[in-house]
């Protein structure tokens, strides 16, 4: 694995046999505990050098297997409920050529990563320290630097409120289209695999009230009034039909004279259902069997077996 980063907030380890760190600082930073080589250079120089040595992998068995599996997964895509995942599924491929997509972290980033855009569309996500970090500020700055390109920003309601002051800048350009997927809470902290859910569950309180900020800014006119007050164009949708009606405007290649903000109202139940659907398109049967056994024997049974096995 080629590692070009510095500080990482990753809470998991990528299982690579070797890690090559490429960075002008030349420092030894063994993030993944598999560091093998350090290249004291810019990543552009590194990849330019190895790109000249490239081989033809078009007939690689591994690449062919990946393509076949991708094809199989796409053929099994279900109909998703109205959610960030559904929005991505009907929008990603329609983004205009040479446009730029900025994604809010966690839910938006994950949802849109499931679907391809055109090859000429560039994607970014300002993850920062993996909190709700300035994606709105980032896209505004980028759009100012490149007025000839169309910029999209897809983010959740909490990320929008966190960085909404950026829209008050008098120089916000008209080549930005912002999609605010408003599910009324911090969904990332709600679903069972999350830390927020685990913490709330362990102390017997509602994750909605104490972790997810459910019901925050519940006025249906808050974003609308703010956006109108700044002189931008505002659209609001709460069904698939309404979204599909305004989709041509969202993905239009024509220049507009005002920044466009689309508030998309979804609910957390649909977000959760869509995530479960897309995560179970292809299931490893061995993992299903293990989960069933664990559920059947319970935690005490698992601990007893571990004790018998000396683990």
Feature map (PLM): residue ranges:
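Generic structural signal for well-ordered, non-membrane alpha-helical segments
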Residues: 43, 59, 63, 80-88, ...
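Short glycine-rich anion-binding loops that position phosphate/pyrophosphate groups of nucleotides
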Residues: 1, 6-9, 25, 106-108, ...
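Short, well-ordered alpha-helical microsegments
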Residues: 9-12, 47, 88, 109-112, ...
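Redox-cofactor binding/interface segments in oxidoreductases and associated redox assembly factors
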Residues: 3-4, 21, 103, 153, ...
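Thiamine diphosphate
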Residues: 114-311
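Active-site diphosphate/adenylate-binding microenvironment
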Residues: 67-146
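A short acidic, often aromatic-flanked loop/helix-cap motif at beta-alpha or helix-coil junctions
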Residues: 27-29, 43-50, 109, 131-132, ...
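Glycine-rich, acidic loop regions that bind phosphate or pyrophosphate groups
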Residues: 1-67, 170-171, 184, 193, ...
């Amino acid at each position: 694995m080629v590692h070009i980063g510095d500080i990482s907030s990753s809470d998991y380890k990528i299982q690579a046999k070797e890690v090559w760190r490429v960075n002008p600082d030349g420092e030894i930073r063994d993030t993944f505990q598999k560091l093998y080589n350090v290249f004291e250079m810019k990543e552009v120089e590194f990849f330019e050098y190895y790109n000249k040595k490239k081989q033809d992998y078009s007939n690689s068995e591994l690449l062919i297997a990946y393509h076949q599996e991708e094809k199989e997964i796409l053929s099994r895509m279900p109909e998703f409920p109205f959610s960030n995942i559904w929005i991505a599924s009907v929008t990603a491929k329609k983004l205009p050529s040479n446009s730029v997509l900025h994604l809010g972290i966690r839910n938006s980033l994950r949802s849109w990563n499931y679907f391809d855009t055109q090859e000429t569309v560039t994607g970014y996500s300002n993850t920062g320290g993996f909190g709700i970090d300035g994606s709105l500020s980032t896209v505004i700055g980028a759009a100012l630097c490149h007025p000839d390109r169309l910029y999209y920003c897809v983010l959740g309601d909490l990320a929008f409120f966190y960085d909404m002051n950026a829209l008050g800048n008098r120089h916000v350009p008209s080549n930005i289209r912002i999609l605010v997927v408003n599910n009324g809470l911090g969904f990332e902290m709600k679903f069972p695999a999350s830390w927020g859910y685990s913490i709330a569950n362990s102390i017997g309180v509602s994750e909605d009230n104490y972790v997810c900020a459910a019901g925050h800014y519940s006025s249906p006119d808050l974003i609308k009034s703010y956006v109108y007050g700044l002189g931008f164009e505002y659209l609001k949708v709460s069904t698939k039909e309404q979204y599909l009606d305004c989709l041509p405007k969202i993905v239009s290649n024509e220049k507009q004279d005002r920044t466009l903000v689309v508030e998309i109202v979804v609910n957390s139940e649909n977000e959760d259902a869509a995530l479960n659907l897309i995560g179970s398109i292809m299931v490893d049967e061995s993992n299903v069997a293990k989960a069933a056994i664990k559920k059947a024997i319970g935690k005490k049974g698992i601990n007893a077996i571990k004790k018998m096995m000396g683990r």
